[in-house]
Amino acid sequence: MAEDPQGGGAGGPQHPVPSGSHSSFPEYELPELHTRVFHVGAFGELWRGRLGAQDLSLNEPQAAAQPTDGEASNNGFEDAAVAEDLGCSLEAAAELRVVCGLDKLRCLGEDEDPEVIPENTDLVTLCVRKGLLDYREENITIDRACRQETFAYEMESHALGKKPENPADMIEEGESILSVNILYPVIFNKHREHKPYQTVLVLGSQKLTELRDSICCVSDLQIGGEFSNAPDQAPEHISKDLYKSAFFYFEGTFYNDKRYPECRDLSRTIIEWSESHDRGYGKFQTARMEDFTFNDLNIKLGFPYLYCHQGDCEHVVVITDIRLVHHDDCLDRTLYPLLTKKHWLWTRKCFVCKMYTARWVTNNDTFAPEDPCFFCDVCFRMLHYDSEGNKLGEFLAYPYVDPGTFN
C-alpha cells in the first residue's frame, strides 16, 4: 500500500489531516475508506527522491556470500558490539549469535516435497486432505473451489519477474504501478455484493486509453439484429466496433475517448443535467482521454470512480494501491495493463441439453417453455429448422454472448 514517507502505511489508523487538493502523498480522509486527493506523479517523484539507487534498482539482489575464515574472525567484534548494546556478557552475546543465527531459521526437512503427505501423520486435517486428494486422483475430478483457487493463482503469478526480450521494452527504475479494480456493470444484477470482476496493474506513464482498451466487457461483444430467418448470416459488426465512445471520471473531470471521428462526448448530457438546476456538484471539466497518463491524475485511493461505455454500461473503478516497481514485478512494459485477477462466472447453459453454453436467445418462441429462452447452437438449429434449414414456427432469435466467455 502507499505510505506516508514520514509515518505509517496506509493500513494503519489514520486521522483527518488538513490538506490541499494536490497533496504529494496519500492522507486518509476517512479511516478504512479512502485517502485525500493526491497527485500520482508527485507521489512517484517524492519516493524517488527519498529512496537510494539500490532501493530503486530492478536488478536481482546478489546472494550473500558464505563467511570465510577471515570473516569468521570478525565474530568476536560483533559479539563485543552486541554485548555493549544489550549490556550483557561476551558469553551471552556469543550464545545469542548461535541461538538466533540465520541457520536456526531453517525448517527441518526443507528438501522434502511439501505436496507429499506422509502416511503416518497424526494430524487430522492432513488425513482429511489426503483423502480428498486420493479421491480426486481416482475419479479424475477437481471440485470448483480447488479449480478457482488454481486459476486465481495462475492469473496472479504468470508474469512475475518476467523480463522483455527487447531491452527497449524494459520498465524504467522508479516507475509507478497502480492497482485498478473494475467492478461489474451497474446494470448487472447477479452479484449485488459489488465485487470486482477484473483487477489490473497499470503503469503511471501509461495513457488512460490503454486501460480503456484492456477492459473486457460483454457489452462490447453484443451483436445487434434479429437472425431467425438467416442464422448463418455473419454479423457485420459487434457493439465495440459501432459505439466507440467512452469516458473515465476522476475527481471532477470527464476524460472522453476522442480517438475516432465517430466518438461522441458521452459526458455532455451529465454536465448539462448537473448545471441545469445548480445541483451543487460544482463545475465539471472535460478532457481527451488519449492526452493524459495516470501520472497526470489527481485521485483518492479506495474512492469509487466511473468508467462508462456503450452509452449506458457503467462500471465503478476503484484504485486500491500505488507503489514503485520492484524487481519481482513483470518488467515487460508491453504486457501492461497486466490482468492479475478475474472473477469466475457461471456460464448459462442451453435449456435443452443442459451441457453446452448458450449461443442463442429467443423471444415469442412457440417451441420454448420460457420467454426468453437460451439454446446452444446445435439444439437451436435442431429445434427451430428443418433438415434443409427452413424456419419452423414463429420466434425471434438473437445471438447471445455469455459473460462466462471471459473465464
From Swiss-Prot:
Family, per entry = Belongs to the SNAPC3/SRD2 family.
Q: Which organism is it from?
A: Rattus norvegicus
The protein in question is named: snRNA-activating protein complex subunit 3
Source lineage:
Eukaryota, Metazoa, Chordata, Craniata, Vertebrata
Region annotation Disordered: residue ranges?
1-26
Q: Keywords for this entry?
A: DNA-binding, Nucleus, Transcription, Transcription regulation
At the top level of its lineage, which domain of life is listed? Eukaryota
User: Which GO biological process entries does UniProt record here?
Assistant: snRNA transcription by RNA polymerase II; snRNA transcription by RNA polymerase III
Gene Ontology MF terms in the entry: bent DNA binding; RNA polymerase III type 3 promoter sequence-specific DNA binding
According to the record, the signal peptide region is: none
InterPro entries xref list: snRNA-activating_su3 (IPR022042)
PANTHER family in alphabetical order = SNRNA-ACTIVATING PROTEIN COMPLEX SUBUNIT 3
Where does the record place it? Nucleus
| Compositional bias segments (type: Gly residues) | 1-12
Major place of residence = nucleus
Does this entry carry the keyword ATP-binding? Answer: no
What gene is this protein a product of? Snapc3
- Kindly state one GO CC term assigned in the UniProt record: snRNA-activating protein complex
Subunit-structure text: Part of the SNAPc complex composed of 5 subunits: SNAPC1, SNAPC2, SNAPC3, SNAPC4 and SNAPC5. SNAPC3 interacts with SNAPC1.
Q: What does this protein do?
A: Part of the SNAPc complex required for the transcription of both RNA polymerase II and III small-nuclear RNA genes. Binds to the proximal sequence element (PSE), a non-TATA-box basal promoter element common to these 2 types of genes. Recruits TBP and BRF2 to the U6 snRNA TATA box.
Instruction: Name a Pfam family for this protein.
Output: SNAPC3
